[in-house]
């Protein structure tokens, strides 16, 4: 896990996303309201370059993330998933892929909007959307019901807070570096005003980060004990320690160094401390990259049956019911499908009827609809299913409860060649 390339790609992508969005927040919300900012057009140009660098890196790392994820899903090389359509299946048939397309459009739009300094609302709105959309493809976006909605809102606020503070730090360092070298009248007063505004934005962001971080941990951990007994919990614990060190540095910046502006020593120390915060913040993002590769302890489900080594398997979870779907063998050709329907406490769900619908990859053919037969052990089975092609299929389980209620559960499933 330590050398997992996908985790590092995720970290780099989040860093680039925070850089682009955070720089927009800093330029519009912190620098923009300061009247004297109009006297420094060169600074605005440098901020725009910083945004474009972040957007370019986020597009590059986003494409790498998509291809690497497709390779992991299909168990193929990077070259094969690019040449044989695996990456396209992930892009066209999954929520993650749709979000990638939407964020690509937002990146292009944001890159153009920063050229229009008179418009403040649109760049901030585009930057915020670009920043929070990954939450819809995260654990929060996959959690069903009201609890999932709360988790999703919390995740979005967590990302916005990180962007307003950590993402804006490179722009703040750029401002301090420019101020340190400037000889132009008005720079000192301008730097003091901007630093004070940013310090208050940082205070609000830290408060929101702590509140949403606690809520997210409550949703993702099975209990406090998981912080030292599980890999997932230990990574969250390390993240908390790093965040605490960043808050300590930010406290020194606000209460010790900011009042001493505009002395050169204060500017130099603020710049040095902000660079330290950026370094620690990137370490936090690396941990986030690895956390996304692990199953949250609150989401770990006990295996109800032994999954055959050649089978394709997916677990579908909704507030009304859960389904474990096993396709054996999990490759193109003829297979048998076993469906176990249960409640959230893993007791058997008393269903009147169960139907199985299989949708082929990228709408490349007609759907297959089957009536499942109940087995003596309580599972439901469909025999002799002909899977015409490999790729990312969509499985839908339609459960008719004893009360007559219809419950639809759907999820992607990978069929090998």
Regions found by a protein language model. Give the residues of each.
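Short amphipathic beta-strand segments in non-cytosolic proteins
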Residues: 355-371
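A generic local structural motif
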Residues: 342-343, 367
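Short, surface-exposed linear segments at secondary-structure transitions and domain or protein termini
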Residues: 361, 375-380, 417
């Amino acid at each position: 896990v330590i050398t997992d390339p996908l985790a590092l790609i995720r970290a780099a992508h989040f860093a680039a996303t925070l850089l682009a969005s955070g720089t927009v927040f800093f330029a519009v919300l912190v620098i923009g309201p300061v009247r004297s900012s109009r006297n420094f057009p060169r600074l605005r140009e440098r901020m725009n370059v910083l945004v474009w660098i972040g957007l370019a890196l986020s597009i590059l790392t986003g494409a790498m993330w998509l291809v690497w994820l497709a390779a992991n899903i299909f168990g193929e090389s990077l070259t094969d998933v690019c040449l044989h359509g695996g990456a396209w299946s992930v892009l066209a048939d999954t929520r993650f892929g749709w979000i990638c397309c939407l964020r690509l459009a937002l990146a292009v739009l944001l890159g153009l909007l920063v050229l229009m300094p008179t418009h403040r609302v649109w760049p901030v709105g585009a930057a915020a959307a670009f920043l929070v959309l990954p939450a819809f493809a995260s654990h929060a976006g996959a959690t069903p019901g009201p609890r999932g909605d709360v988790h999703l809102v919390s995740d979005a606020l967590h990302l916005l807070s990180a962007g307003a503070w950590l993402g804006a730090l490179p722009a703040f360092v750029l401002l301090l570096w420019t101020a340190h070298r400037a000889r132009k009248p008005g720079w000192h007063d301008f730097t003091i005003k901007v630093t004070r505004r940013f310090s208050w934005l940082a205070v609000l962001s830290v408060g929101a980060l702590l509140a949403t971080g606690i809520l997210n941990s409550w949703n993702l951990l099975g209990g406090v004990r998981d912080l030292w007994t599980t890999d997932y919990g230990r990574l969250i614990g390390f993240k908390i320690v790093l965040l605490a060190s960043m808050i300590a540095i930010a406290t020194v910046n606000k209460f010790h160094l900011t009042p001493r502006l505009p002395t050169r020593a204060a500017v130099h120390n603020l710049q040095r401390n902000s660079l330290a915060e950026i370094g620690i913040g990137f370490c936090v993002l690396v941990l986030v990259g690895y956390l996304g590769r692990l199953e949250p302890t609150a989401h770990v489900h006990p295996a109800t049956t032994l999954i055959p080594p050649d089978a394709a398997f997916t677990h579908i979870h909704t507030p009304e019911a859960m389904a474990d779907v096993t396709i054996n063998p999990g490759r193109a050709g003829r297979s048998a499908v076993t469906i176990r329907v249960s409640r959230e406490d893993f007791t058997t769900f008393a269903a009147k009827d169960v139907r199985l619908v299989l949708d082929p990859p990228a709408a490349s053919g007609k759907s297959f609809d089957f009536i499942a037969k109940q087995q003596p052990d309580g599972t439901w089975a469909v025999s002799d299913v002909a899977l015409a092609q490999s790729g990312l299929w969509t499985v839908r389980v339609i459960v008719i409860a004893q009360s007559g209620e219809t419950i639809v559960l759907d999820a992607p499933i990978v069929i090998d060649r």
